[in-house]
């Protein structure tokens, strides 16, 4: 579906927290209408946005439903997202639904899921560190006698969260 009937260029900003304030301010200074989306009604970026949507940035379907009400009033020209987690997928889904140029859903999923990211790097010849995908049940036998190791979840919600170093089997088990 192509958005028509509008001469108001609008940018969708996924999240309105402290780290998004400058993005919202800059978009406004460039003359764009800013639709800010955040689950926290007290998000500081909301005070700069033209339109505020209180919704989780993880819930693409709910956000798309909200944006549907606005699509005839504004021309969506971009989706901004400073996250490296699940909101990247939300941004891709919004872009696809409203035919806004942006990252593909597959690329977004590859970016968010570290296993998929490494597989994609390998497929396209992009160097990346050696890794092993394993389940919780396998980990004690797979890595025995190869310590220290770095353990990182495939789906980290915030940057480097969940990373740990195991120097022994006991540390790996805990």
Task: Go through each PLM region and give its residues.
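Glycine-/Pro-rich loop/turn segments that contact NAD(P) or position catalytic residues
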Residues: 96, 108-129, 136, 140-142
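Hydrophobic beta-strand scaffold residues
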Residues: 34, 102, 128, 149-150
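Short acidic-hydrophobic, aromatic-tinged amphipathic segments that line or gate anion-handling sites
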Residues: 52-58, 131-136, 164-167
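Glycine/Thr-rich phosphate-binding loops of Rossmann-like dinucleotide-binding domains
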Residues: 62, 89, 141, 159-160
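ATP-binding N-terminal substructure of ATP-dependent carboxylate-amine bond-forming enzymes
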Residues: 1-107
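Glycine-rich phosphate-binding loop of ATP-grasp-fold ATP-dependent ligases
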Residues: 130-131, 148-174
């Amino acid at each position: 579906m192509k958005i028509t009937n509008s001469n108001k260029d609008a940018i969708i900003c996924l999240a309105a927290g402290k780290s998004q304030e400058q993005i919202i301010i800059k978009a406004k200074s460039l003359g764009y209408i800013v639709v800010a989306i955040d689950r926290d009604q007290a998000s500081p970026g909301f005070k700069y946005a033209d339109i505020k949507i209180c919704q989780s940035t993880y819930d693409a379907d709910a956000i798309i439903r909200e944006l549907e009400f606005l699509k005839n009033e504004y021309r969506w020209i971009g989706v901004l997202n400073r996250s490296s987690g699940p909101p990247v997928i939300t941004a891709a889904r919004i872009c696809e639904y409203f035919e806004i140029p942006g990252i593909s859903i597959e690329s977004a999923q590859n970016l968010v899921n570290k296993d998929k990211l490494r597989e994609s790097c390998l497929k396209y010849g992009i160097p990346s560190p050696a890794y092993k995908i394993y389940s919780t049940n396998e980990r004690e036998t797979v890595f025995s006698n190869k310590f220290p190791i770095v353990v990182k979840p495939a789906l980290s919600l915030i940057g480097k969260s969940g990373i740990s170093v195991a120097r022994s089997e006991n540390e790996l088990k805990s």
